[in-house]
Amino acid sequence: MEKTVLIGIITHEQGLEKSMDYLDELAFLTMTAGGTVTKTFTQKLNNPNPKTFIGEGKINEIREYIKENNIQTVIFDDELSATQERNISKIFNCKILDRTNLILDIFAQRAKTSYAKTQVELAQCQYLLPRLKGMWTHLERQKGGIGMRGPGETEIETDRRIVRNKISLLKNKIKAIDKQMHVQRGNRGKLVRVAIVGYTNVGKSTLMNLLCKSKVFAEDKLFATLDTTVRKLVIGNLPFLISDTVGFIRKLPTQLVESFKSTLDEVREADLLLHVIDITHSNFEEHKQSVEKILSEIKSLNKPTLLVFNKIDNYQAVEIEADDLITERTKKHYTLDQWKKTWMNELGENVIFISAKDKKNIDDLKELMYSKVREIHVTRFPYNNFLYPEII
């Protein structure tokens, strides 16, 4: 396990609580990538330092810690510019990563199919291109001077050309596979399509396995699923298609959103979305907003959607003593019943609370799915609505 330290900043927009939540998530990402976190550093900043992201005093404090504890990798919670990465690398003299780089590394580890590997490689190349100059710092002393004019720059330009060519080849390869996958989706006929979406590690694959009695890879790690899995599911006598998709995350690199276009096409072309939410997470509402932001970016936010609150078997409200009249009651003190009332008042029958692990309320979910899929199917094929009763 690589010894790592994490670095985050506290700003006016990103207060202490939110910053610590992001860093907890970064620690989970680090563990998923095979690292172990020895310490977390934070600094209050109005604006990141354009040269080193954090201030000089904090830089010196971290540098001493790195030396004393033989730290191999430093990971920043925000994306670093090429200049910042280069400057920090010189000061710390160890591997420097940011959240984007870390996510790309996890995706590279998790990619199993040729298509997923191609998508990840494209995202990595797009991330790498503006950072090539920093990788040639060992040639900086050769720049300029008599007889030493520009060998470093020549190497950089050569590398840039290689990476640009690689990007072009990968894009063409993805286009070809996209066409093929579009044809495959077309060949599935007119069956209603349901896509399971949600934040990473909320239990989408576990739910997919339960509904379809199939074996989609599910694990308590971030991004356990990269490749979209499509299954035919029959509830009552109504057949439809259901797909499990890659999990979303806050600060998801734009390169990945672009690269995983075809994976997201499963969401774009779906008739109904099952938005799975981990109700046990203290910031599940923010996770919901992050997913909806990406759905909006791919023009899928207004699709018919069922909100599926998962992991109710593990939900625990923060308790307050009955005679405590000082502590302010907030959402973290809500009981499960209070959350149910809150969301059902807002969204009515489009909400359900389940436990995929304990199979709790799964029959109710199936009935709700049947009702929604039947509604779409009957609209599409009004002449055969008699085949599918309103209630199963």
Report residues per predicted region.
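N-terminal accessory targeting/assembly segments
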Residues: M1-I103
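C-terminal-of-GTPase-core extension/linker across diverse P-loop GTPases
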Residues: E2-I7, A27, Q126, P130-V202, ...
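Conserved Switch II/interswitch segment of TRAFAC-class P-loop GTPases
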Residues: E13, N49, E79, R268-Q289, ...
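Switch/connector loops and helix/strand junctions flanking conserved nucleotide-binding motifs
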Residues: Q14-E17, T52, A82-N87, L104-F107, ...
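Switch II of P-loop NTPase G domains
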Residues: M20-D24, N47-R63, D227, V246-E269, ...
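Conserved catalytic network of the ASCE P-loop NTPase/AAA+ motor domain
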Residues: I66-E68, S89, K232-G236, L241, ...
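Short alpha-helix plus adjacent loop in nuclease-associated cores
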Residues: L102-V120
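Switch I (effector-binding) loop of TRAFAC-class P-loop GTPase G-domains
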Residues: G186-G189, L210-F240, I249, T254-S262, ...
